[in-house]
Swiss-Prot record:
Ranges for region Interaction with CDT1 and CUL4A: 771-1140
Name listed for the protein in its UniProt record: DNA damage-binding protein 1
Molecular function terms from GO: cullin family protein binding; damaged DNA binding; DNA binding; protein-containing complex binding; protein-macromolecule adaptor activity; ubiquitin ligase complex scaffold activity; WD40-repeat domain binding
Major subcellular location class: cytoplasm
Family: Belongs to the DDB1 family.
Domain statement: The core of the protein consists of three WD40 beta-propeller domains.
Region WD repeat beta-propeller A: start-end pairs: 13-356
Protein's organism: Homo sapiens (Human)
Quaternary structure, from the entry: Component of the UV-DDB complex which includes DDB1 and DDB2; the heterodimer dimerizes to give rise to a heterotetramer when bound to damaged DNA. The UV-DDB complex interacts with monoubiquitinated histone H2A and binds to XPC via the DDB2 subunit. Component of numerous DCX (DDB1-CUL4-X-box) E3 ubiquitin-protein ligase complexes which consist of a core of DDB1, CUL4A or CUL4B and RBX1. DDB1 may recruit specific substrate targeting subunits to the DCX complex. (Microbial infection) Interacts with Simian virus 5 protein V.
Stretches the record annotates as WD repeat beta-propeller B: 392-708
Domain of life of the native organism: Eukaryota
Protein localization: Cytoplasm; Nucleus
Length: 1140
């Protein structure tokens, strides 16, 4: 068996649908957004969208409509999922708790029936008498809306018109009436039918219209007074209502296809239309009042408003604000203005919502050499195409920044005796000290009486007896707060300079070379208590009081030069309690005693970014449990701060890190800043609960996230990225992308808009000796769109496009790899292409092109003609492995820098995906699932080891380990196949057994090994092995990791118990949702744990947790089973949340 845990690292971000109405209350205007399986509910306010609730559905949302039956005070929500679960939901709020109640539910799937090519359509009669569904060809399904029907019952009505394009209910009809566009061999037509609930039949409709435009694709039902319907085509817009027929063909809409629409006014006089290029139009219906007072339609008019993201759905909110939901790019809130701007646009973007979808390819790189992967994705398409850089970390939100180079330390002060909050920030520089006064959000430079400003400060702070202290290189100065004046000063007897110092509210320890002095702070007096000599110079020291020692520290921690040791000394005697040799030659730069979750620790950071941490016994001063992590490459400065009433440590370096404790384990979390040299906590009136941070040039004040999460940076390309790889030697990414150009009158083509490939710093164009350009069998015609493919070289630091290489006409770039070949020391970018002509069923020729990028130039080193499309390439033991149409081929790299075929494997339909491990090759086929090959180096050929004989249409594959292979297929499922080496017969050995099945509900485009969290930092007890990330069409990022059998069984038990306790929205069974489901079979999920469900344990109430753990057997690592407590499981689940 294979045991795996699958969990969401980033929820889907592509918007599939949106509706607006009064769902949370009759007064609230709501926006509801569907993102595949997730439903987000917002209230529209004057300030923008306010999130109310997010609901995870056990299903892909296919239909989402608000409606208000008679007798209801607010709207209800109808949802239909892709697995045909229908439900009617209501919003209920009591106090703080919000519930989404399932008023009615049922499954409306038919045993037989051919699912319609145009997808699922769901509509609701304007009078709320029924819901209509078009799920299968030739059938119209009706759900009557009775008052108190808990179960949704449906019946079918036969439709003679098999191929329905779109259907709507009409307004103002006595009986519910549908209007639809359908296609038959003669063309497309519009027809209406009345639906009789009693006879469960169609009656003849009020009107029909034969032979409408051949591309007519959308029906818009128009409310009264007009009534009737608008039909949207590729070139024309027509209005029908039986008596009246009006058609317009505005040239402006011909350029692209209109894909979505939304009514602006309740009376239907204005509609928004969005097309595939992201253009937004207004359709206006002009009225004419007749003598008898009736209103008829006088004219239709279309106006171009401007450009938005490419819309999947539009919804008009209020006051000229429109929500543009996008699947191919970021969604937007836009404002429609009365007057146009200089570019002639009436549209202004107000807010943008990040969307990673569709993730076409991605790679994990550790750009900052930090042991933490960043994910770089090829996201979006057409003008919305971009790269997204995704990393996990703690965010700092900048509130103010001041240009101040050279800061060497900073401290907050409360300058007045009775202040609760900080009002001053003291900054130290080489040879000087500056004081900033904080007044609200204003910052101004000031002077503090009693402080010196011509020396570098080592420490500054509020101390006991309403006093301030300033420790400089020359002396320790005690200053009274009221009035501000120097009351006591301590200098080293020979007036030597102080080199390091530490201070708490009533104690000071300073080091002068090898000497240590201990002072106590009394009212208006610094009293020297003791001093001692160490055998080496003191590099760092700390006297933070721990435990309940009344603010006094009985211990002093120091780090020494020369012998590179950390020591714990007793105060006041300076008696040595513990000496820890750190080893190596790098001196300790910062030392800190701190308490996390009531455990005491000593942290010691060295000058090379390494950090040692120990358990500290505050009674004896002994250190235990020595551990080491690497946090950066430069000297690290440790400072504590409090956030959410817990202690955290901020490690300042070239790779700032926050250290905190969870389940008595230290967690090291990246901060999304490039570099921090010094920091201090700041809690002022204008900047409450903030941090002040200094780097080489700037002082920043900001607040910190409570938890670590994914941070996403966008690099717009304005064209479609297809493939990405990283090349360390040149510090670049290679990206394959395509832009759309349009054929002009001269026979050439022009780009639609500037994009990455047209704006690169330098460019080149393929000229191939292999294909003469005249042999192209396909001539393009004027106005036709053509794809132009490029290899982009992108700088890893600035993400600037350094070079764009354009491929041949009709040449599609399909695969990309960066690797070394044979004994050749150079690293190459290698691209696989296909010559694509519309009249060919599959490509008959293509190229493999080897490029080298160095010193800012891209050179073509070699090219190889192949008889087909190069779908996939990987480096394989110093050779190049490629899949070309149905062939898997291995090339070796000769000393003449040419690719020479070594061996082939032919037994595939279309080999789309390749992954390798050692001498094993996993091949993913278009329709024949996966196949395992082994390369025999001695014979120089491939041997077919085993294959999965189930017909899975693959979308991505990955090797989990030597025996387990992960696949994703086109019905949104994951499966794991296992090689059965122990089988007795050859035939059994040749079968890959499907040992894991799971319905993900997402279309996976790419798998890759890697992790988004810091690797090997701190300790973990979760027994997960390996980490495979995946990216999907909806912009979801997920993770698959392997479990041991005992952990799998525990989590499976927990999963089953959670299903009994957590009520699903829409009353859909979890087991039904996660069951592996294709057109040919449905099987229960097995071998996979649903991590999203497991993690929801942390969100349920304590009593529900108790319900889950009742009688659950749990092995806490001692080998003995006992009954689990809620806290045991909280620990387990918190550990699991940390893997993503």
């Amino acid at each position: 068996m294979s045991y795996n845990y699958v969990v969401t690292a980033q929820k889907p971000t592509a918007v599939n649908g949106c509706v607006t109405g009064h769902f949370t209350s009759a007064e609230d205007l709501n926006l509801l957004i569907a993102k595949n399986t997730r439903l987000e509910i917002y209230v529209v306010t004057a300030e923008g969208l306010r999130p109310v609730k997010e609901v995870g559905m056990y299903g892909k949302i296919a239909v989402m409509e608000l409606f208000r039956p008679k007798g209801e005070s607010k709207d209800l929500l109808f949802i239909l999922t892709a697995k045909y679960n229908a439900c009617i939901l209501e919003y209920k709020q009591s106090g703080e708790s919000i519930d989404i109640i399932t008023r009615a539910h049922g499954n409306v799937q038919d045993r037989i029936g051919r699912p319609s090519e145009t997808g699922i359509i769901g509509i609701i009669d304007p009078e709320c008498r029924m819901i209509g569904l078009r799920l299968y060809d030739g059938l119209f399904k009706v759900i009557p809306l009775d008052r108190d029907n808990k179960e949704l019952k449906a019946f079918n009505i036969r439709l003679e018109e098999l191929h329905v394009i779109d259907v709507k209910f009409l307004y103002g009809c006595q009986a519910p009436t549908i209007c639809f566009v359908y296609q038959d061999p003669q063309g497309r037509h519009v027809k209406t039918y009345e639906v009789s609930l009693r006879e469960k039949e169609f009656n003849k409709g009020p009107w029909k219209q034969e032979n409408v435009e051949a591309e007519a694709s959308m029906v818009i039902a128009v409310p009264e007074p007009f009534g009737g319907a608008i039909i949207i085509g590729q070139e024309s817009i027509t209005y029908h209502n039986g008596d009246k027929y009006l058609a317009i063909a505005p040239p402006i809409i011909k350029q692209s296809t209109i894909v979505c629409h939304n009514r602006v006014d309740p009376n239907g006089s204005r509609y928004l239309l969005g097309d595939m290029e992201g253009r937004l139009f207004m359709l206006l219906l002009e009225k004419e009042e007749q003598m008898d007072g009736t209103v008829t339609l006088k004219d239709l008019r279309v106006e171009l408003l401007g450009e938005t993201s490419i819309a999947e759905c539009l919804t008009y909110l209020d006051n000229g604000v429109v929500f543009v939901g996008s699947r191919l790019g970021d969604s937007q809130l836009v404002k429609l203005n009365v007057d146009s701007n200089e570019q002639g646009s009436y549209v202004v973007a107000m807010e943008t919502f990040t969307n990673l979808g569709p993730i076409v390819d991605m790679c994990v790189v550790d750009l900052e050499r930090q042991g933490q992967g960043q994910l770089v994705t090829c996201s979006g398409a057409f003008k919305e195409g971009s790269l997204r850089i995704i990393r996990n970390g703690i965010g700092i939100h900048e509130h103010a920044s001041i240009d101040l180079p050279g800061i060497k330390g900073l401290w907050p002060l409360r300058s007045d005796p009775n202040r609760e909050t900080d009002d001053t920030l003291v900054l130290s520089f080489v040879g000087q000290t500056r004081v900033l006064m904080l007044n609200g959000e204003e910052v101004e430079e000031t002077e503090l009486m009693g402080f010196v400003d011509d020396q570098q400060t080592f420490f500054c702070g509020n101390v006991a007896h309403q006093q301030l202290i300033q420790i400089t290189s020359a002396s320790v100065r005690l200053v009274s707060q009221e009035p501000k004046a120097l009351v006591s000063e301590w200098k080293e007897p020979q007036a030597k300079n102080i080199s390091v110092a530490s201070c708490n509210s009533s104690q000071v320890v300073v080091a002068v070379g090898r000497a240590l002095y201990y002072l106590q702070i009394h009212p208006q007096e610094l009293r020297q208590i003791s001093h001692t000599e160490m055998e080496h110079e003191v590099a760092c020291l700390d006297i933070t009081p721990l435990g309940d020692s009344n603010g006094l520290s009985p211990l002093c921690a120091i780090g020494l030069w020369t012998d590179i040791s950390a020591r714990i000394l007793k105060l006041p005697s300076f008696e040595l309690l513990h000496k820890e040799m750190l080893g190596g030659e790098i001196i300790p730069r910062s030392i800190l005693m701190t308490t996390f979750e009531s455990s005491h620790y000593l942290l010691c950071a060295l000058g090379d970014g390494a950090l040692f941490y120990f358990g500290l016994n505050i009674e004896t001063g002994l250190l235990s449990d020595r551990k080491k992590v690497t946090l950066g490459t430069q000297p690290t400065v440790l400072r504590t701060f409090r956030s959410l009433s817990t202690t955290n440590v901020f490690a300042c370096s070239d790779r700032p890190t926050v250290i905190y404790s969870s389940n008595h384990k230290l967690v090291f979390s990246n901060v999304n800043l490039k570099e921090v040299n010094y920091m201090c906590p700041l809690n002022s009136d204008g900047y409450p609960d903030s941090l002040a941070l200094a780097n080489n040039s700037t002082l920043t004040i900001g607040t910190i996230d409570e938890i670590q999460k994914l941070h996403i940076r966008t690099v717009p390309l304005y064209e479609s990225p297809r493939k990405i790889c990283y090349q360390e030697v040149s510090q670049c990414f290679g990206v394959l992308s395509s832009r759309i150009e349009v054929q002009d009158t001269s026979g050439g083509t022009t780009a639609l808009r500037p994009s990455a490939s047209t704006q690169a710093l330098s460019s080149s164009v393929s000229s191939s000796k292999l294909f003469s350009s005249s042999t192209a069998p396909h001539e393009t015609s004027f106005g036709e769109e053509v794809e132009v493919h490029n290899l982009l070289i992108i700088d890893q630091h600035t993400f600037e496009v350094l070079h764009a290489h354009q491929f041949l006409q009709n040449e599609y770039a399909l695969s990309l790899v960066s690797c070394k070949l044979g004994k050749d020391p150079n690293t190459y970018f290698i691209v696989g292409t296909a010559m694509v002509y519309p009249e060919e069923a599959e490509p008959k020729q293509g190229r493999i092109v080897v490029f080298q990028y160095s010193d800012g130039k891209l050179q073509t080193v070699a090219e190889k003609e192949v008889k087909g499309a190069v779908y996939s390439m990987v480096e394989f033991n110093g050779k190049l492995l490629a899949s070309i149409n149905s062939t898997v081929r291995l090339y070796e790299w000769t000393t003449e820098k040419e690719l020479r075929t070594e061996c082939n494997h032919y037994n595939n339909i279309m080999a789309l995906y390749l992954k390798t491990k050692g001498d094993f090759i996993l091949v993913g086929d278009l329709m024949r699932s996966v196949l395992l090959l082994a390369y025999k180096p001695m014979e120089g050929n491939f041997e077919e080891i085993a294959r999965d004989f189930n017909p899975n249409w693959m979308s991505a594959v990955e090797i989990l380990d030597d025996d387990n292979f992960l696949g994703a297929e086109n019905a949104f499922n994951l499966f794991v196949c296992q090689k059965d080496s122990a089988a007795t017969t050859d035939e059994e050995r040749q079968h890959l057994q499907e040992v894991g099945l799971f319905h993900l509900g997402e279309f996976v485009n790419v798998f890759c090994h890697g992790s988004l969290v810091m690797q090997n930092l701190g300790e973990t007890s979760t027994p997960t092995q390996g980490s495979v990330l995946f990216g999907t069409v909806n912009g979801m990022i997920g993770l698959v990791t392997s479990l041991s059998e005992s952990w799998y069984n525990l989590l499976l038990d927990m999963q089953n118990r959670l299903n009994k306790v957590i009520k699903s929205v829409g009353k859909i069974e979890h087991s039904f949702w996660r069951s592996f489901h294709t057109e040919r079979k449905t099987e229960p999920a097995t071998g996979f744990i649903d991590g999203d469900l497991i993690e929801s344990f942390l969100d349920i109430s304590r009593p529900k947790m108790q319900e889950v753990v009742a009688n659950l057997q749990y092995d806490d690592g001692s080998g003995m089973k006992r009954e689990a407590t809620a806290d045991d499981l909280i620990k387990v689940v918190e550990e699991l949340t940390r893997i993503h």
